[in-house]
Amino acid sequence: MDKKLLFQPIQIGKLKLRNRMVFPPMNTNYSNTDGSPMELMMDYYARRAKGGAGLVVVESTTIDPTSRNHGAQSQFSDTSYIPLYSKLVDKIHRYGAKAAIELTHFGADGTVSSGGEEPAPSDVTSRGAQYSVHAMTIDDIHAMQEQYVQAVVNAKSAGFDAVTFHAAHGNIMPEFFSTLYNKRTDWYGGSLENRVRFAREIVEMARKAVGPAFPLIMRISGDEYIEGGRTLDETVEICRILEKAGIDCFDVSGGIQASYIFSIAPYNLPGLHGFMMPSAKAIKEAVNVPVIGVGGVRDPELAEKFLEEGYADMIALGRSFIADPDFGVKAMEGRSADIRPCLTCGNCFNEICCDRILTCTVNPETGREDDFKGIEEAKEKKKVLVVGGGAAGMESARVLALRGHKVTLLEKNDHIGGSVSAAGVP
C-alpha cells in the first residue's frame, strides 16, 4: 500500500476505516416526500464508496418530521425508515466503505411548513432564516433530546457504523452553544457549561443507549464567522466537554446559516483552499480523539500536506467526490492528473437552495448514477472520426476512447474547447 497518510487506515473508537478520505454530509434533495431515501440517493452514496472513500456520511437527516431546511428533506424520525436506510447502508458496504448518518434538528434555521413556530433556545429568530420561533420549555428540551437518542438507536439498527451529530452551519445544537441565539437564564443558558448542556446530555444519553463501541461523531463549526458569534477559543472548550461526554471524533467545519458564504472556498483564490484547517488543528491539539478537517481541499496532494503537518487525522473531500466520484481510486493509483476538479462554481449549492436535486457542472453523472452504471467496452472496436473539438466533441471522443475505439478528434482552430474557452476568459 502507498505510504501516504491519506491512504492509511485509521480508527474512530473501535471502528476501522480503510483510509482517511471522508465523503462528508451534504444535502442532495434525493429523498422521497416522506423523507425516506430514494434509490437515487442510495446509488449516489454507493458511487462515492466505490470511488474510494473510507467513510461515507449520509446527509443532514432530521429527527423530527416537522423540522425542515430544504425541499426534499431526509428524515429518520421513527423505525419505519429502517428498511430503506438499511438498503442504503448495504450499498455503501458493498464497496468496502463504512457508513455514517448525520442527525439534526434545524431549530430556528428550519422552514415553517405547517404555519407554526420553530423551536429555539430563546425568542430570537435566526439571522439566516428569519422564521417565527418560540423559546423551548424544559419539557420541550427533554422531548427533543429523546428524539435524538431514538434516532441514534434507529441508525444503529439500520446498520450504520456511526452517527454524526450536526452542530455546524446553524441548527438547534449550535443555537444553544451561541450567545447570539441563547438568551436563557436557566440550566441551559448563560455560562458555556450551561449552553453546552443540551448537546452534552444528548451525547451521554446516546452513549448509554448504544453502548461504548458505537462511534459518535460531532460536526461543529470552529468559528461562526459572524460578529458576536462563537469563536475558535470557545469551540475548543466545547469540544473538550463533549469529548468527556462520549464523542469519538470531531468533524470541524465553519460558519452558520447567516454566514454560509464563508463555508465554500472560492476556486480562484487558491490561498483559501483548506482555509478551515487551522480550526481543525486547534481542536486536534486540544482533544484526544481523531479530527476530520474540511474546507475546499480539492486535490490529494493538499490533503496529504494537511495530514503530514498535523492539521487533522482525516480529510473531508465532499465536492471533490461530487465532481469526480473516482477521486479516491485515482488518488491511490497515483493518477491525480486524471481527477476531474471541482470548480467551486456553487452550482451544487444553488440547486439545493432552489429546492432542486443536486447536480454538478462538471460531472453529468451526479444525480444520474443509475444511468451511468459504467462505460462498457465495445464488442466491436472501430476507428472513429470526431469533427469539432468543443465540449460535445471532446466528451464524445473521451467516451468512445474509454469504450475501446481508436478515436481521432479534428478541430479547425489551433486549440480545443470551443465556447468553453471563451467562457473561461475573466
Where are these regions (language model features)?
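Flavin-dependent oxidoreductase catalytic cores
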Residues: M1-V407, K412-H415
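N-terminal Rossmann-like dinucleotide/flavin-binding domain of flavoprotein oxidoreductases
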Residues: G418-P426
